[in-house]
Amino acid sequence: FSKNKEIWRPNLLPRSEDMNARYKNPDNDPRGVWKPADFSVKTYSAANDFPIKTPSGRIVTPPKSRCRVTSEDQFRELVSENRIWFGETGNNVPSVKKFLSEVKDGSVSMTIWLYQDVGHNQDAKKEVKDFNETEVFGTPKPEKLMQRIITLATNENDIILDSFLGSGTTAAVAHKMGRRYIGIEMGEHAVTHCVPRLRKVIEGDQGGISEAVGWKGGGGFRFYRLGEPV
């Protein structure tokens, strides 16, 4: 939910080591590591449909129904700037060099989130057992999932509201990430799960995302009973 969907933009996610590892420097370019990107696009333009002669002498044309990313003049400029790669033998289809030093500090979130990145329910249940081994909570969320959501949607010191706090995952992750938070829970797990979980967080709990965010403990929270459940 956003107050204004026209102006809200999600934050970028931190770049992972795997993402950066895709950048190499086979030609020892002084601008640093780079990766090749397709030099053709689907949005066809006759002005950008031109043959290219590779350094080896081979003539290559764009794939069917596609054209070059730039005009021929712009392509020549890229060649003069050593931004076009024809492979180590000079015989490959041209690609444009994308330098790591020129990309954004983060990455745009994909619409599909894999369990390797955001965890799964088994992770969440293990996290709950760390502070309550006797009372099972049926549907906990993994801390990595909430970390992804909070990273995309908020900034440090923002206020996060979870009106169905459950096992306290949102509050625990918000605390570790330097956000303020309000959690509402009518069930008894407010006492059996949320309170002990937050106490462990304050004590420096190293479960969940703690290592990833460098959590060492600290802070505090207030617990209120506002009335009998309706």
Residue spans for each PLM region:
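Charge-rich, low-complexity amphipathic helices
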Residues: 23, 97, 101, 196, ...
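Active-site lining segments that contact anionic ligands and/or coordinate catalytic metals
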Residues: 47-49, 110, 160, 167-170, ...
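Conserved S-adenosyl-L-methionine
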Residues: 139-211
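Class I S-adenosyl-L-methionine
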Residues: 2-159, 191
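S-adenosyl-L-methionine
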Residues: 199-229
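Generic beta-strand/beta-sheet core signal
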Residues: 1-2, 116, 161-166, 184, ...
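A glycine-rich phosphate-binding loop feature that marks nucleotide/adenosyl-phosphate handling sites
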Residues: 17, 92-101, 166, 215-226
